[in-house]
Amino acid sequence: KEGYPVDWGNCKYECMSDAYCKDLCVDRKAKSGYCYKLNWSCYCEGLPDDSPIKTNGHCRPGGRRK
């Protein structure tokens, strides 16, 4: 699947470089990833079906963990 990976607080990962997002996505078993610069967030392609991605829920910043 594709989407914005989220941390424990349901927050997207902010980015400025494609390399950061590629590493983050590959760590989550995705095929690839990049920094979507229109909203400065990592976007992953080829994630496993059970990987959490951003949905309509609110971001709870206290939950940031890698």
UniProtKB/Swiss-Prot annotation:
<dbReference type="InterPro" id="IPR044062">
    <property type="entry name" value="LCN-type_CS_alpha_beta_dom"/>
</dbReference>
<comment type="function">
    <text>Alpha toxins bind voltage-independently at site-3 of sodium channels (Nav) and inhibits the inactivation of the activated channels, thereby blocking neuronal transmission.</text>
</comment>
<feature type="disulfide bond">
    <location>
        <begin position="21"/>
        <end position="42"/>
    </location>
</feature>
<feature type="domain" description="LCN-type CS-alpha/beta">
    <location>
        <begin position="1"/>
        <end position="60"/>
    </location>
</feature>
<feature type="disulfide bond">
    <location>
        <begin position="11"/>
        <end position="59"/>
    </location>
</feature>
<dbReference type="GO" id="GO:0019871">
    <property type="term" value="F:sodium channel inhibitor activity"/>
</dbReference>
<dbReference type="InterPro" id="IPR002061">
    <property type="entry name" value="Scorpion_toxinL/defensin"/>
</dbReference>
<dbReference type="InterPro" id="IPR003614">
    <property type="entry name" value="Scorpion_toxin-like"/>
</dbReference>
<comment type="similarity">
    <text>Belongs to the long (4 C-C) scorpion toxin superfamily. Sodium channel inhibitor family. Alpha subfamily.</text>
</comment>
<keyword id="KW-0964">Secreted</keyword>
<dbReference type="GO" id="GO:0090729">
    <property type="term" value="F:toxin activity"/>
</dbReference>
<protein>
    <recommendedName>
        <fullName>Putative alpha-neurotoxin RjAa13</fullName>
    </recommendedName>
</protein>
<keyword id="KW-0800">Toxin</keyword>
<dbReference type="GO" id="GO:0006952">
    <property type="term" value="P:defense response"/>
</dbReference>
<dbReference type="Pfam" id="PF00537">
    <property type="entry name" value="Toxin_3"/>
</dbReference>
<keyword id="KW-0872">Ion channel impairing toxin</keyword>
<keyword id="KW-1015">Disulfide bond</keyword>
<feature type="disulfide bond">
    <location>
        <begin position="25"/>
        <end position="44"/>
    </location>
</feature>
<feature type="disulfide bond">
    <location>
        <begin position="15"/>
        <end position="35"/>
    </location>
</feature>
<keyword id="KW-0528">Neurotoxin</keyword>
<dbReference type="InterPro" id="IPR018218">
    <property type="entry name" value="Scorpion_toxinL"/>
</dbReference>
<dbReference type="GO" id="GO:0005576">
    <property type="term" value="C:extracellular region"/>
</dbReference>
<dbReference type="InterPro" id="IPR036574">
    <property type="entry name" value="Scorpion_toxin-like_sf"/>
</dbReference>
<keyword id="KW-0738">Voltage-gated sodium channel impairing toxin</keyword>
